[in-house]
Curated annotation (Swiss-Prot):
Keyword list, A-Z: Cytoplasm, Ribosome biogenesis
GO cellular component terms given for this protein: cytosol
Role played: Required for maturation of 30S ribosomal subunits.
Locations listed in the record: Cytoplasm
Family: Belongs to the RimP family.
Entry protein name: Ribosome maturation factor RimP
Length: 155
């Protein structure tokens, strides 16, 4: 279950990212760390690579916005990075690009039990992730999805 502050932090970060020419690809609030850590992944809306200077510049702007919003009242660490090239899908663009590709989906059910499914990525919308498992579409509520990774068939 996500931290109660995460939706507000995500909304603020998306707004700041958009104003700076970035797209928010991922955000995590790691409350088990001391101090807590806010990890943010960004990419340029133009599709160009994010470099270290971009991350440093965005860190300053987002840090100021976080201080002004007073959403995080305790000490925290802010980490800014790019998603890089990896197997984990995170941005809407990733889910559009890799539609029809084989994926492993890790999710929690309503009883908070973790499950893993394999299938072909069908669609992700605001409410759910849909994968094709042997010709049948399985819909998983988006808030229950932990991770979606590209895989190779038969792996």
């Amino acid at each position: 279950m996500p931290h109660p502050l995460l939706p507000e932090l995500e909304q603020l970060t998306q707004r700041v990212a958009g104003l700076q020419g970035f797209e928010l690809c991922g955000i995590q609030l790691l409350t088990h760390m001391n101090p807590i850590t806010l990890q943010v992944q960004i990419r340029h809306t133009s599709g160009s690579d994010v470099n270290l200077d971009d991350c440093a510049g965005f860190s300053g702007v987002l840090g100021e916005a976080l201080e002004e919003s007073q959403q995080l009242v305790e000490a925290y660490v802010l980490e800014i990075s790019s998603p890089g090239i990896g197997e984990q899908l995170s941005c809407d663009r990733d889910f559009q690009t890799f539609r029809g590709f084989p994926v492993d989906v890790t999710h929690r059910d309503q009883g908070n039990v973790e499950h893993r499914l394999e299938g072909l990525l069908h669609e992700r919308n605001t409410d759910s992730l849909q994968i094709n498992i042997r010709g049948r579409i399985k819909s998983i509520p988006r808030d229950q999805v932990i991770e979606v990774r590209l895989t190779t068939p038969g792996q």
